[in-house]
């Protein structure tokens, strides 16, 4: 009873992918499932998203895990390979590689592979993280074209740095740069992430790379209203994080609650202790007033988040009982709201769920 639970609705996951495909019928979906499926479980998510045209992961270990459990779909590794041993694994397990630096090109040229490799040339149009500059990219593309180790055509991709910003100036510049540099290149193209998927229909090219939206979460947080109604109407949250009330206490006016005595009762009042804390991945920096959902009603967090427990104000829930479920985020309480309160992003909260949280799959 004491363990927090992350309930993963695989039906919602499948539904979200179907919505993405319906909104971009001319594009293929490259489902991003890196970082343990955004905290939802790598293998679980891959099996649920069998209708995706390909999967995107961050590193070779994630890709090999999928192959080991029998996932046969195309897998593209976003950071590519870094030595000959890894490169051989790419060929052996039919993994696609993102090529983003000259060291990788050199490795391809000097390594004898058992089979040719599917690759994507990453063009840095302004993210300034990985990829070849706009000026370098044509020469690298021509160099890759001559390699017998590479399948043709070569994929062409970029990554948008600011697609979730209502000011579109920089993203439009990135898209313009990409179309310009790839104009004479032959190969499938990929530009958009989840935010770009909604905000830049002109960039819905051959492949789209949905990530956070697959899990029913807005890439815009709670402050960007242009797509709020569409996202809430068409997409469903996949993860619901919950924990149980393990104690109810009646506290007196001026009693402090929790470490540091940072919060005090304004009157005599009931409080509940809930079996979740930062040791489970709930954000320690969530302030008093952060909402939780109890029996369909909002209750505020009070005091500091502890490693194993939080306290909540029960004044709106006088009939609450030990054993009642408290929803920390998910169905009925968007994780974007909790992220905003905690001064972070939903991605971080999802990826920080720890191993002691029990995961349950449902189809609903």
Swiss-Prot record:
<dbReference type="Pfam" id="PF00842">
    <property type="entry name" value="Ala_racemase_C"/>
</dbReference>
<comment type="similarity">
    <text>Belongs to the alanine racemase family.</text>
</comment>
<feature type="binding site">
    <location>
        <position position="129"/>
    </location>
    <ligand>
        <name>substrate</name>
    </ligand>
</feature>
<dbReference type="InterPro" id="IPR011079">
    <property type="entry name" value="Ala_racemase_C"/>
</dbReference>
<feature type="active site" description="Proton acceptor; specific for L-alanine">
    <location>
        <position position="259"/>
    </location>
</feature>
<protein>
    <recommendedName>
        <fullName>Alanine racemase</fullName>
        <ecNumber>5.1.1.1</ecNumber>
    </recommendedName>
</protein>
<keyword id="KW-0413">Isomerase</keyword>
<feature type="binding site">
    <location>
        <position position="307"/>
    </location>
    <ligand>
        <name>substrate</name>
    </ligand>
</feature>
<feature type="active site" description="Proton acceptor; specific for D-alanine">
    <location>
        <position position="34"/>
    </location>
</feature>
<dbReference type="Pfam" id="PF01168">
    <property type="entry name" value="Ala_racemase_N"/>
</dbReference>
<comment type="function">
    <text>Catalyzes the interconversion of L-alanine and D-alanine. May also act on other amino acids.</text>
</comment>
<dbReference type="GO" id="GO:0005829">
    <property type="term" value="C:cytosol"/>
</dbReference>
<feature type="modified residue" description="N6-(pyridoxal phosphate)lysine">
    <location>
        <position position="34"/>
    </location>
</feature>
<dbReference type="GO" id="GO:0030170">
    <property type="term" value="F:pyridoxal phosphate binding"/>
</dbReference>
<dbReference type="InterPro" id="IPR029066">
    <property type="entry name" value="PLP-binding_barrel"/>
</dbReference>
<dbReference type="GO" id="GO:0030632">
    <property type="term" value="P:D-alanine biosynthetic process"/>
</dbReference>
<comment type="pathway">
    <text>Amino-acid biosynthesis; D-alanine biosynthesis; D-alanine from L-alanine: step 1/1.</text>
</comment>
<dbReference type="InterPro" id="IPR000821">
    <property type="entry name" value="Ala_racemase"/>
</dbReference>
<keyword id="KW-0663">Pyridoxal phosphate</keyword>
<dbReference type="GO" id="GO:0008784">
    <property type="term" value="F:alanine racemase activity"/>
</dbReference>
<dbReference type="InterPro" id="IPR001608">
    <property type="entry name" value="Ala_racemase_N"/>
</dbReference>
<dbReference type="InterPro" id="IPR009006">
    <property type="entry name" value="Ala_racemase/Decarboxylase_C"/>
</dbReference>
